[in-house]
């Protein structure tokens, strides 16, 4: 049954009829005018840099519903990576890439004083703009356009009049990564490697691409588009902190000359094209873990976005597409968090899934009463995905030099001048770290890390990442660091599985295992004659796609296209079985690096000599 992400028509509900005002979010009734008073609030250990325009920590006092509140804000120091870049294109098609200074930015996370469940995502670039949760309710704040005034409007989310529009939905219809063996709720049955992986912080290095329609939608203003993207990613950070995942914006690319792929009203075709472009082009220019296309196009039907499920870190499939469907960036950020959630193994919430709010991030319906929370179902699906797949790219911890803005003790990032950072003294759970100074306690060599045990480095030679099969190697602690060295594996092209295959990036891809993964333990590889269907160049058989056109396999490449299996389970008589679902046509293709002949492997849809491939 199709599962959809609906964007409901949110009707305004007013406790009383007040005057109306037009704000960036739209026409708003029942708003409150406030005058925030700023009070500098540097955390312990932080030193205000005289050249800074925006403080590392600030707090504001104002009233909500006539009652005073104090908003505590800390700069989102993990928002940008050290090598953050921005790319756009000149009218004559030249690519312009710059590395703008982002140390002194104006994007903050925060909380309301004396409200333990409060959250906030605020930009302080020109007044206060953003949203905060207070006593379980979501409020928006933005400056009023009154010259020489500090007046701001505060209003509840539901008090924005929405244009009447058809509901939207996410194009994802099912998960595709499920393993044969369910993961039990208890961690007692997990391997040491799995336990370590689950406990580790995760970092998603993100690229956001804005298409040509976005460029025109925002009056061809690069700065306006950048600001909108910054606001979205700042909110993404708040959302994913609840899963111990940190989002770092690596690059923004704006297709200001024209789209570099065929962006169409078909969400599926656009997602597929974007994934191909990422693998073919973007990854060769910019190191990153995940890319999201922000588009101004209206997709066919009610679709508002789409993402591949459980494919984080995979070159073509670690992508999502999101329609810029609302003036309210919080709604767009929630939709992007939803599609990235699919990349991280989460499906749509069922009716019995709960998060303690009216709506959850992976809910099939994106309601007016949006929240930052993932449901219990989403958390378990995400955990199961991490245990089964253990995607490695999101373990890359930013180096101290990756965070170039002035250090702030208590933001969970170890920055220049710090030895550890376990959060605020109230939240720190690391007995090796002094939360007040972000220095290790006397006698401690380390605070956390796979190669840290009871505040000491594990001895050299201790296995910190066991080998996962014959194409992998065990990685060992050095005795000089708390971190496990970079994952190493056997050289690509080394024979494996008794010469049934060749090692490829730490795995031994062979067709038989791929058939079992798709059809179950009784499946085997089909006869060679079945693979001749790959010469047809349609969805039943092809080798690769170029601009959404399926390219037929050459006779010598037929075993590098669609995988043909023999399903021996009862009731199946087709000797040439394929795995095909319209929502993910690429699922069921022969994996890269698979043996296609003696001394031959599949590479980009071709059967090539193993010595040439690697």
UniProtKB/Swiss-Prot annotation:
EC number(s) reported in the record: 3.4.24.-
Residues at which Ca(2+) 2 binds: 408, 411, 413, 415, 418, 421
Annotated ranges, domain Disintegrin: 406-492
Annotated glycan sites: 262, 505, 547, 568
SMART domains: ACR, DISIN
GO biological process: apoptotic process; proteolysis
PTM comment text: The N-terminus is blocked.
GO cellular component terms, A-Z: extracellular region; plasma membrane
Record domain Peptidase M12B: where: 202-398
Subcellular localization, as worded in the UniProt entry: Secreted
Name this polypeptide is given: Zinc metalloproteinase-disintegrin-like VLAIP-B
Species of origin: Macrovipera lebetinus (Levantine viper)
